[in-house]
Amino acid sequence: MLIAVDHGNKQIKTVHTPPFTSGLIQSDTPGFGTDALAYRGKYYTLTDQRIPYRRDKTEDERFFILTLFAIAHEIEAMGQYSGSLMRVQLAVGLPPAHFGVQAKRFINYFNGRGAVAFQFKGKPYAIFIENTACFPQSFS
């Protein structure tokens, strides 16, 4: 399944779902939101408070977690949810000013993670990112 995610400094954008702010809250306990995502023993919810500007989005896991939200939203929007492992080809977008310097690092940020298990809205997801292609924003 091909999923395109535009990783803006202000918003995350996908093809089939409305954009959402590039911000999240991490907790050790499940939150109250229905759109909670659980990954590696932590719980995440989206927030309208965006992550402070980051020249390098691979410095920590936050943009990976935001990508998991985007992938889950896209799978739901396309009616493709499956309780089994889903193979994903990822097309990602970076701001044009950072594309030349960071494209390879951003591709490596997503590739090579193996099967990624998480829960979204209480449902278990398992994805395997087979390949990642990186484009300047608005082209992914």
Each language-model region and where it sits:
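Nucleotide/phosphate-binding catalytic cleft detector across ATP-hydrolyzing
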Residues: 1-140
